[in-house]
């Protein structure tokens, strides 16, 4: 049974086909792949009138529970969850755990991708016990790792929702991750089978599988840093410049996860791992990593320049407008009424952006100071003065970066709508 991600309440058949081909591998040639409707809304990303995450997840959780109870008598159920539906699936596992796992392990299993509740990397697990009431957003914690059900969780490296840095004081790493929300998190069904098959199985705590653990965690490598995608988009020189700086920038980004060689936390995947302050990396390791990165960057830059030299130069063509075209354009100009209506629509769209901005500001003015004070007191009681001061700062850096990308997405959506409305006026 296939559930959509945020913004896709009713996935098309192609969605289920791809998800099955890449991740689930159900072999039912004579049966249609079942699709389950859930709200999949997320204020403000899916719109200023959308349900909040808490509301959408709550409704989805009820729908999923009812579906499984109705279907379980007909045979085993496999749940495929992506992004928000991975959250719903994780919370359903929590419900089953609280009930003593009433459903037989032979009758239920899960395949999750882009899971914001990954124990070690999920954004909702990195900042435990945080709630933002003005945004209707609770940080739910981690997907249970102690269920008797077979669970496979796939994550792409640098997916900011499912693979958020462990050390958020590293702003560059945070920024790369939040760019990855738009460029990596949305691409799980765009991968090839070879890319999915290249996934690395992540380590779990000693004895996890021997003691009955049944959740398998996989990391799919991402070839290029999301942070450099805007640079690569620059014609001609973009790719060479990105190739030059990427190896060393990757070291900096990866330090946000704890190891300059990996864009994900290499500690146990089944253990909820909250954010920390500084990674434990020796100076010699850093020196070697930057030295190797510098050599690799120069080599890649040279390779890109050689490839650039072999490409023919193409000049743009220009066709001057003809008088007949100008006359036709003038005759099709929009009416004053249409211009006024479009202006009103644009103003309304832009005004709507202010509401989520105000809610975010209120959350940062109320909920965040409370969270910071809790972090401070927890560390102070433990006698750790450095963490008492550093943890609130690290949390703020990470959360402000997340809020920034959310506002950017909201504003970008409004600008896109404005452009579409204005284009409709042009004959």
Q: Which residues does each PLM region occupy?
A:
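Lipolytic serine-hydrolase domain surface
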Residues: 13-21, 25-50, 122-264
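Conserved catalytic block of serine-dependent lipid acyl chemistry
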Residues: 78-80, 92, 219-223, 273
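Serine-dependent carboxylesterase/thioesterase catalytic core
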Residues: 61-158
């Amino acid at each position: 049974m296939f559930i959509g991600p945020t913004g896709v309440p009713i996935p098309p058949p192609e969605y289920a086909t791809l998800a099955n081909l890449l991740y689930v591998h159900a072999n039912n040639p004579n049966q249609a792949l079942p699709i389950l409707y859930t709200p999949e809304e997320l204020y403000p990303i899916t719109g200023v009138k959308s349900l909040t995450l808490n509301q959408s997840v709550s409704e989805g959780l009820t729908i999923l529970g009812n579906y499984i109870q109705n279907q379980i008598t007909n045979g085993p159920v496999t749940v495929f969850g992506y992004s928000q539906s991975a959250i719903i699936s994780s919370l359903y596992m929590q419900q089953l755990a609280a009930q003593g796992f009433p459903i037989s392990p032979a009758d239920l299993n899960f395949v999750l991708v882009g899971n914001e509740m990954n124990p070690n990397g999920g954004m909702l697990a990195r900042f435990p016990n945080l709630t933002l009431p003005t945004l209707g957003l609770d940080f739910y914690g981690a997907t249970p790792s102690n269920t008797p059900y077979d669970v496979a969780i796939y994550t792409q490296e640098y997916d900011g929702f499912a693979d958020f840095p462990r050390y958020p004081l590293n702003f560059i790493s945070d920024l790369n991750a939040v760019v990855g929300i738009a460029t990596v998190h949305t691409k799980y069904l765009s991968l090839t089978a070879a890319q999915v098959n290249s996934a690395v199985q992540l380590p779990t705590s000693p004895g996890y599988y021997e003691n009955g653990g049944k959740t398998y965690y996989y990391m799919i490598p991402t070839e290029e840093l999301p942070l450099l995608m805007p640079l690569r988009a620059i014609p001609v020189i973009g790719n060479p410049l990105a190739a030059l700086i990427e190896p060393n920038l990757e070291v900096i980004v990866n330090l946000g996860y704890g190891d300059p060689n990996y864009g994900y936390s290499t500690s146990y995947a089944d253990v909820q791992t909250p954010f920390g302050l500084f990674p434990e990396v020796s100076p010699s390791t850093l020196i070697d990593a930057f030295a190797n990165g510098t050599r690799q960057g120069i080599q890649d830059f040279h390779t890109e320049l050689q490839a650039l030299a072999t490409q023919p130069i193409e000049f743009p063509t220009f066709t001057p407008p003809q008088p007949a075209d100008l006359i036709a354009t003038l005759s099709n100009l929009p009416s004053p009424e249409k211009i006024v209506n479009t202006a009103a629509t644009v103003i309304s769209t832009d005004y709507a952006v202010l509401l989520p901005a105000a809610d975010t500001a209120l959350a940062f003015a109320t909920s965040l100071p409370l969270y910071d004070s809790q972090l401070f007191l927890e560390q102070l009681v433990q006698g750790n003065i450095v963490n008492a001061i550093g943890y609130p700062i690290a949390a703020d850096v990470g959360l402000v970066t997340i809020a920034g990308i959310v506002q950017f997405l909201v504003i970008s959506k409004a600008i896109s709508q404005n452009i579409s409305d204005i284009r409709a006026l042009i004959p």
